[in-house]
């Protein structure tokens, strides 16, 4: 039986620094490697890299522009995956949405895929997804975020993938949704540093929902008591302004900020990774990637983070009042478990070696690429029948 998969997502393909986009691109490559005829129809919506234009991004991917379209349409390949994209504006607009939706519907009719892969719940994709199902395709929606608590988001979906038991339970409790839990697709060669020289305590993406407030409290105390511990913050242009607005960060003598780049470069200079997320994180990709590099991640006890690290990370509490909307710093006492753990692992070589070994071991058990690739392929070739998407 000929199997084919079309990823339809009103987002930029494999956007740098965007875990969801990178995961979906990896998943497509896995399916292509298993014999699926794989293609993607994407757009110009960039979510995590405000300094990157879609033209620059598509040029880096080696895509070619077609003449005569109302907006630029580009085509090319990502290895075995055929790519076509509309260079819409980086934010949704009616004209771009309509053009993208029409092109997606054309692709469905032309390619007649056996499977549609999608994420983001974009309304302009509704007609294309409905047409695919009418032609017998199976629509698989992957949930990367926590906001999809309306059954209407899944109106044209046959099966749903979530990335943690936490997220599966949350959606089941909110809207009665049945889903299959699988980790996001992650390529080890794309994230594992070749020649690591770990020197930094690293914090990635200093946004409110990622924990900039508890991070600032830790940085302030480290500046007073342990200024010898260098801190690296990985931040895009828009996030740098948020950092500059926090007086607590001005005192640290060894706090460096760098833009998002190849994750292997970041993990290659990271000794400990901070993930003090106050929000209910659906998974925690950076924590998993850190463990692949033998870097102990220090993660909050919120959402799917404890699940993502298993026995390979250190799960630490945040004060109950602390949410992503908090506008005051937690006290030293409230953040002491974090501070004490950082200092212990920084100073005690034996303790660090034990934690690093646990990270390596857990990542191999949880995220071995060969096993995850096979599990993904098995999921897509399963002919069913499948349980109802929603509980009665």
Which sequence ranges carry the predicted segments?
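Donor nucleotide-sugar binding/catalytic pocket of nucleotide-sugar-dependent glycosyltransferases
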Residues: 158-191, 209
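A conserved catalytic-core segment of Leloir-type glycosyltransferases
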Residues: 46-110
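Acidic donor-binding loop of glycosyltransferase active sites
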Residues: 268-282, 295
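Conserved catalytic-core segment of nucleotide-activated headgroup transferases in glycan assembly
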Residues: 188-190, 195-251, 257
């Amino acid at each position: 039986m000929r199997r084919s998969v079309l990823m339809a997502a009103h987002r930029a393909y494999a956007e740098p620094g965007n875990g969801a986009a990178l995961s979906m691109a990896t998943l497509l490559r896995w399916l292509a490697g298993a014999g699926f005829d794989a293609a993607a129809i994407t757009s110009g919506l960039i979510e995590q890299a405000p300094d990157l234009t879609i033209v620059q991004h598509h040029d880096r991917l080696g895509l070619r522009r077609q003449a005569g379209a109302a907006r630029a349409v580009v085509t090319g390949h990502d290895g075995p995956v055929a790519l076509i994209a509309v260079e819409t504006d980086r934010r949704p607009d009616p004209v771009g949405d309509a053009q993208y939706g029409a092109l997606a519907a054309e692709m469905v009719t032309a390619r007649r895929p056996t499977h549609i892969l999608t994420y983001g719940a974009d309304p302009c994709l509704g007609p294309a997804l409905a047409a695919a199902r009418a032609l017998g395709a199976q629509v698989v929606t992957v949930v990367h975020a926590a906001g999809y608590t309306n059954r209407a988001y899944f109106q044209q979906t046959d099966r749903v993938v979530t990335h943690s038991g936490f997220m599966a339970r949350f959606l089941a409790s909110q809207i009665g949704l049945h889903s299959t839990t699988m980790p996001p697709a992650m390529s080890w060669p794309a994230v594992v540093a070749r020649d690591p020289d770990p020197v930094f305590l690293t914090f990635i993406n200093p946004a409110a929902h990622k924990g900039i407030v508890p991070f600032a409290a830790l940085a302030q105390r480290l500046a007073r008591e342990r200024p010898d511990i260098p801190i690296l913050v990985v931040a895009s242009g828009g996030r740098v302004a948020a950092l500059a607005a926090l007086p607590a960060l001005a005192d640290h003598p060894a706090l460096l900020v760098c833009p998002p780049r190849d994750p292997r470069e970041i993990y290659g200079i990271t000794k400990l990774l901070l993930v003090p997320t106050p929000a209910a994180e659906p998974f925690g990709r950076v924590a998993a990637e850190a463990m692949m590099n033998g870097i102990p991640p220090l993660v909050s006890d919120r959402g799917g983070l404890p699940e993502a690290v298993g026995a390979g990370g250190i799960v630490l509490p945040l004060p109950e009042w602390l949410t992503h909307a908090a506008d005051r710093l937690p006290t030293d006492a409230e953040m002491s478990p974090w501070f004490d753990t950082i200092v212990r692992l920084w100073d005690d070589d034996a303790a660090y070696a034990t934690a690093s070994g646990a990270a390596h071991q857990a990542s191999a058990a949880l995220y071995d690429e060969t096993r995850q690739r096979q599990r993904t392929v098995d999921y897509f070739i399963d002919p069913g029948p499948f349980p109802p998407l929603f509980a009665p």
